[in-house]
Amino acid sequence: MARNAEKAMTALARFRQAQLEEGKVKERRPFLASECTELPKAEKWRRQIIGEISKKVAQIQNAGLGEFRIRDLNDEINKLLREKGHWEVRIKELGGPDYGKVGPKMLDHEGKEVPGNRGYKYFGAAKDLPGVRELFEKEPLPPPRKTRAELMKAIDFEYYGYLDEDDGVIVPLEQEYEKRLRAELVEKWKAEREARLARGEKEEEEEEEEINIYAVTEEESDEEGSQEKAGEDGQQKFIAHVPVPSQQEIEEALVRRKKMELLQKYASETLQAQSEEAKRLLGY
């Protein structure tokens, strides 16, 4: 069974409506809302616009109308919404209610508005048109920024480069580079040597002789000999352990030194002599 909206669109229904309106003068809606000076008529034209919007919103739900028809319907709905806003402003000027605050906004909320697009809305199948769907897709949130404490948790020996040689890659490369660098230095030294020989220069003995870094000089042997003592048979005798004063002995020596400094500073010569005599008698 056909719906009421489809019945109203049939040819017979339109013909019957035309017969009923033959003897009547159809009043047309003013082009500008400011041309209307009566509040009841302004209310009438507003209701008429709402009815037209409702019909077009119902039509645009059909995705089989085609892209161009859907775009035209969406443009017409937005145009009627702007016109409805003009009539609401005019009604308020004529002393009527402020529909911008108290009026229903169901028709406005049926469409989605693209931010920054001057109030243009998309209704029904227009939301799924090519190029429109992407406008409503939300951008992914950026990853949360890590704090300094979280970054410090990920720092290990590898961050400081202590594990660079464990991967088995850098060591062969370093060996190859070292081998190549040594060969270059040897070739350079040979070239310089041949150039000096060609000029007739003699090489210095310091360059020919290798310095023995393990050789012990006489000065070093004298210093080391200060810790050695000769035995009865003339052989060297090494001291295995050098006595070191304990912490208590060091503290007692510091106390005695401090007492002597105080006596020299505050006591007279006679008192110091008496103190020394008393120590001698007591056997200190």
Swiss-Prot record:
Q: What exactly does this protein do?
A: Component of the spliceosome C complex required for the selective processing of microRNAs during embryonic stem cell differentiation. Required for the biogenesis of all miRNAs from the pri-miR-17-92 primary transcript except miR-92a. Only required for the biogenesis of miR-290 and miR-96 from the pri-miR-290-295 and pri-miR-96-183 primary transcripts, respectively. Required during the transition of embryonic stem cells (ESCs) from the naive to primed state.
- What organism does the UniProt record list as the source? Rattus norvegicus (Rat)
Annotated GO biological process: generation of catalytic spliceosome for second transesterification step; mRNA 3'-splice site recognition; mRNA splicing, via spliceosome
Query: What is the protein's quaternary organization?
Result: Identified in the spliceosome C complex. Component of the XAB2 complex, a multimeric protein complex composed of XAB2, PRPF19, AQR, ZNF830, ISY1, and PPIE. Identified in a pentameric intron-binding (IB) complex composed of AQR, XAB2, ISY1, ZNF830 and PPIE that is incorporated into the spliceosome as a preassembled complex. The IB complex does not contain PRPF19. Interacts with CPSF3; this interaction is in an RNA independent manner. Interacts with the microprocessor complex subunits DGCR8 and DROSHA; this interaction is in an RNA dependent manner.
Q: Which residues carry this modification: N6-acetyllysine?
A: K127
Q: Which GO terms describe its cellular component?
A: catalytic step 2 spliceosome; nucleus; post-mRNA release spliceosomal complex; post-spliceosomal complex; Prp19 complex; U2-type catalytic step 1 spliceosome
The primary location reported for this protein is: nucleus
Name of the protein in its database record: Pre-mRNA-splicing factor ISY1 homolog
Location within or outside the cell: Nucleus
Q: Which gene encodes it?
A: Isy1
Acidic residues compositional bias, start-end: 203-225
